[in-house]
Amino acid sequence: MNRINILNADTANKIAAGEVVERPSSVVKELVENSLDAGAKNITIEIQNGGESLIKIIDDGSGVHPEDVEKAFNPHATSKIKDTYDIFSINTLGFRGEALPSIASIARVDFKSKVSDFDMGKELVISGGEKESLTDCSMNRGTQIEVRDLFFNVPARKKFLKTTARESALINDLVNRISLANPDVSFKLFNNNKKILNTYGNGKLIDVIRTIYGKSTAENLIYFEEHKDTASVYGFIGNDTLARASRNNQSLFVNKRYVKNRSLTVAVENAFRSFNVTGKFPFFVLFIDTYPELIDVNIHPTKSEIKFKDERFIFKVVFDAVHSAMREYVKDTFTLPEEEEKKFEALKEEVIQESLDEEISTLEKLKENINYKVSEDRKKEEIYSYNPSKDYEAKTEVNIPVDFLSKENQEESFSINNSLENNNFKEGSAKREISYDPILIKNELKDKVSESTSESLERSDYKCNKNEYGNSIEEIIYREAKFPKLRVIGQFNKTYILAEYDSTLYLIDQHAAHEKILFEKYSSDIAKKRVEIQPLMIPLVVTLPTEDYLYYDENKEIFEKAGFKISDFGDNSIRIEEVPYFLDKLNPTELITSMINNLKKMGTGETVEVKYNKIASMSCRAAVKANDVLSILEMENLIEDLRYINDPFHCPHGRPTIIKFTSYELDKKFKRIT
């Protein structure tokens, strides 16, 4: 039978350390919070090797009394509370007395501190929980603590650490959040002796935001605030230009403590989406000040989670504050141009001048025209002989930057397409329900075209040369067409291409189709290491937030192989010199920012191939859009390119690119048959 044992202090501290000290950023959090509780106004953080080799914190707080230096490293020793009642009215960031003994048990610690009432300070050296020395030292008022060789005596914990770059990024993100919560404190962060962050400590939150996230972010913020009897809510929310695909740029503080609360995050997002339908997550910095008695922070060892006595009330206050600010912002930015007002007034006067009889006559004729069926004497030839290209000739054409077949080889390729077109692909059954399933369309068309395609390819005698995209003709011609050549009829709503083949009408989403072409082309080029690049006439210098720069630096090789030529420009700035050829019309700054955000969402566990696919998906932004007018030739080229990609039936996001209606289905819809 197992007997109950009393654990020794070392074992108990290491168990406690497992809860409190998860990684280097946990150490930084606990020590910086101690500095803030001591009233420090200047805090310097230095790290080496992602915090594993060294974490050094220097502050100008009140310091630790000489007689309490040793006592501070005893378990549950704290100056923050005295009894149980204090737990329910906590005004400090720390209170458990677990951090220092937990850290000292798994690292080598050099602790120095001095209070203003004494001429000398005290220095305590501890290694693995064992005191090595306690001596006097000379220093200014405040505290300095060095934590070296983290987890040196618990090597199993090291296996769970991420890369040095990632651990550094986590520390940087943590210090950024703490800086936002304390704009009246000056923070300096050094990583491997390089200054990463320096806030002014002037008490202005907007200055801290500008330092961390950049000038453009600070210029696109909306301030909000709401005050109630038991809670005050205030902060900034970004407009739609700052919305991102992840929640990385969301910060929530309760009584200056950085916490995570799903309910309050949803409150902000719901208020934001009342005025924006981007589907992305808003940037926000939210502060909630309330009485300590109305919250409970003692539910998690890291104090990162919090409970409210009345969470529904807080939810409503947050929602109302953000919603009101967004409503005023939209109202202020919406203005009717004076020119449009003048046109409206002129038109109104013109209508008033018309006689009542003429208005009645006009309305009656309009009613007759709406309810009147198509005249019997209108010939079908007039409908089917209509040439849509005439309407498009006078409009601006949209260039499609991807064409798998070069202009020199298009003529030759038409011989194959014509041979496919001349074959009779008959419907297997006339009576079928209308189908929107791209898989069914794919399988049906693939069966129809495969046999004829192989016969046509056997008869073709193309020479193996390179086209303008670097693909050999062999690579292009001997790729199977996934559906037969369609005849373009026109464009509907400047969004869908109408085409026909063998008594079947096809609707192609021009944006979805083009983005899939670009996606497969770009993915293939990355895999084969032959991405064609486009030099920028004027290189762009982009200053990134520190966290974004660290992600870029970690994935620098990914960007290079994806066709970007980027060089460091100092102080978290990068210089964009070249981009992939078909992305040159996009905003490189927004493109790089979006790619970094996508990589941040993926984390470090994904493979290089997955990251390449994620970057390739950004090619969607270069695709033709809905409401882009295309000429007949452009639509034909788009469909021709679509035929030869690996999966022409889905866009990169999984949506269908093609749907079809058979003649039978249309006849049934018009009740020509029963």
UniProtKB/Swiss-Prot annotation:
GO terms for biological process: mismatch repair. Pfam families: DNA_mis_repair, HATPase_c_3, MutL_C. Keywords: DNA damage, DNA repair. Disulfide bonds: none annotated. One of its GO terms (molecular function) is ATP-dependent DNA damage sensor activity. One of its GO terms (cellular component) is mismatch repair complex. It comes from the Bacteria. InterPro entries: DNA_mismatch_repair_CS (IPR014762), DNA_mismatch_repair_MutL (IPR020667), DNA_mismatch_S5_2-like (IPR013507), HATPase_C_sf (IPR036890), MutL/Mlh/PMS (IPR002099), MutL/Mlh/Pms-like (IPR038973), MutL_C (IPR014790), MutL_C_dimsub (IPR042120). This protein is involved in the repair of mismatches in DNA. It is required for dam-dependent methyl-directed DNA mismatch repair. May act as a 'molecular matchmaker', a protein that promotes the formation of a stable complex between two or more DNA-binding proteins in an ATP-dependent manner without itself being part of a final effector complex. Belongs to the DNA mismatch repair MutL/HexB family. This is DNA mismatch repair protein MutL.
